[in-house]
Amino acid sequence: MIKRALISVFDKTGILDLAKFLESRDVEIISTGGTYKHLKENGVKVIDIEEVTGFPEMLDGRVKTLNPLIHGGILAIRDNEEHMKVIEEKGINPIDMVVVNLYPFFNKVEENLSFDEKVEFIDIGGPTMIRAAAKNFKDVVVLTDTKDYENVINEIKENNQVNIQTRKKLAGKVFNLMSAYDAAISNFLLEEEYPEYLTLSYKKNMDLRYGENPHQTAAYYTSTVGKYPMKNFEKLNGKELSYNNIKDMDIAWKTVCEFEEVACCALKHNTPCGVAIGDTVQEAYTKAYECDPISIFGGIVAFNRKVDKETAENLAKIFLEIVVAPDFDEDALEVLKNKKNLRVIKCEEKSTEGKDMAKVDGGILVQKSDNKLLEDTKVVTEKSPTEQEMKDLIFGMKVVKYVKSNAIVVVKDGMAKGIGGGQVNRIWAAKEALDRAGDGVVLASDAFFPFGDVAEEAAKWGIKAIIQPGGSIRDEESIKVCNEKGISMVFTGIRHFKH
C-alpha cells in the first residue's frame, strides 16, 4: 500500500494526473522547489520537503533532498524490525513511492553554454534518490519515465498496489538510465579519445521488425548527446525503416556529404552502385542511374541538395527503398508520396561522426573515422593528369572510400562508371570495375598496387590516369607500366581500407 510519495521532476509531463490520482487515494505527497510550486498552483495538496527535513534548500538548490530524513524513509526495509525501529526512533516516515526525473544533461551539454553552466545540469540529488529507491524496490515504487505513469496508475486501480515484477522492472530502468547518464557526464568531463573504460550513452530510438535477416531480432539506438545525421533525420513518407535500411542510408548519406558539388549516390547492400556529380540534381541522378541501371533497383538514392519535381518524377519510375536528401520541393514530395511504401527521408545534418566502432565477440574496436581524403599528393609518373582528369581522380577517391576493400572505381566526367569492391585481391576488383565501366578515363584505388598487374589491366581499357595511396615495395613496377603506356599516376599517401 502506497501511503507516502516524494515527487521531484524536471519534466512535468503527466505529473498532475499522477499526483491527483495519488491524492484521490489519500497518499501524502512531498515535493521540492519548482515541482512543489507547480503542484500547489494546480490544486494538489502537497508538503514542502523543508517541512519534512526541517532544513532549507542551500547552495543554490544543490542540496535539497540529501538528508537522512528522506533517504532513511526510502531505504528502510519494511520487513526488517531493526530498520523500522530505528526510523521510528528518529522520527522518519517511510516513503513508498519516488517520482523523479533528472536535470536534462543530455540536452544541455550540446547547447551554447559555458562549461560551468553545463556542470550545473549534472544532477546529484535526483540520482541519489532514485538509486536508493531502486535498491529498495521491494518496498518502494520508483518512477523515472513519464511513459510509466499510466501503467502504474492502472495497476494500482486494479490491484490496489504495484506488483513486485513491475517494481523490479522500474528499478532496472533506474540503473539503465543512470549508466547512460553517467556515461554522458564522464565523456563530457574526460574528453579522452580512448578512455580506460568505454562508456556509451545511447537510447532506444525504435524497435525494428527484424535484423539483417528475418530470424534476427533488432532495435535501433541513437546517441543521447550530439547531433548526427542518423539520429536527427525526419521520415516524411513510407514504411518503417529496417535494420538494413538504416545501415545503407548511413553510407549513402556519408558518400554524398563528401562533395561540395551537387551529388547523387545510388547504393545497394551497403555498397555504392552509382555515384555522380552534376550541375543540377536531375543531372546528378541521371548520371548515377546510368552507372548501373540494374543494381539501383530496390536500392537507396541519396542527394546532397533539395530534390525538385522533375527528379522526383524520375525517381518514381523505379522501385526504390529510400530517397534521402536535405529537403524536397513541395511538388516533389507530392510525387514521391504517391508511392506509399517509399521511405522519403529529410536529413539536414552533415556527417560528423568522429569515431567508428565495430563489435567482435567479447570486444569493441574503436578508431577515428576515415575523414582525411589525401595527404602528400604527388605525381609519380612522367606524364601528369590534365585538370579534368585530376578532378575525376579526386572524385574517384571520394567514392572508393565507401566501397568494401579491395576497391577500385573507374570514373569519367564526374561519374563512377564502374565500381569493383569486396574482392580478396586487387586485380579482381580492377577487372570488375573496368568491365562494368566499359569505358572510363581514370581509375581510383583504396590501397596500393602490390604488383604492376592493375596498371597493365587499366592500360588495356584505355585508362589515362590512376590515383592510389602508394607505399608498395613494388611501386616501381606500376610506375614503369604507367610510363610505358602513357598513363599518369598520382600517389596520395592515404589508404582507405573498408571492411
Curated annotation (Swiss-Prot):
Residues 1-144 form the MGS-like domain. It catalyses: (6R)-10-formyltetrahydrofolate + 5-amino-1-(5-phospho-beta-D-ribosyl)imidazole-4-carboxamide = 5-formamido-1-(5-phospho-D-ribosyl)imidazole-4-carboxamide + (6S)-5,6,7,8-tetrahydrofolate; IMP + H2O = 5-formamido-1-(5-phospho-D-ribosyl)imidazole-4-carboxamide. InterPro entries: AICAR_Tfase_dup_dom_sf, Cytidine_deaminase-like, MGS-like_dom, MGS-like_dom_sf, PurH-like. Pathway: Purine metabolism; IMP biosynthesis via de novo pathway; 5-formamido-1-(5-phospho-D-ribosyl)imidazole-4-carboxamide from 5-amino-1-(5-phospho-D-ribosyl)imidazole-4-carboxamide (10-formyl THF route): step 1/1; Purine metabolism; IMP biosynthesis via de novo pathway; IMP from 5-formamido-1-(5-phospho-D-ribosyl)imidazole-4-carboxamide: step 1/1. It comes from the Bacteria. Its EC number is 2.1.2.3, 3.5.4.10. One of its GO terms (molecular function) is IMP cyclohydrolase activity. One of its GO terms (biological process) is 'de novo' IMP biosynthetic process. The keyword Kinase does not apply. Keywords: Hydrolase, Multifunctional enzyme, Purine biosynthesis, Transferase. It holds the Pfam family MGS. GO terms for cellular component: cytosol. PANTHER family: BIFUNCTIONAL PURINE BIOSYNTHESIS PROTEIN ATIC (PTHR11692:SF0), BIFUNCTIONAL PURINE BIOSYNTHESIS PROTEIN PURH (PTHR11692). The IMP cyclohydrolase activity resides in the N-terminal region. Belongs to the PurH family. HAMAP family: PurH (MF_00139). This is Bifunctional purine biosynthesis protein PurH. It comes from Clostridium botulinum (strain Hall / ATCC 3502 / NCTC 13319 / Type A). The lineage of its organism: Bacteria, Bacillati, Bacillota, Clostridia, Eubacteriales. The gene is purH.
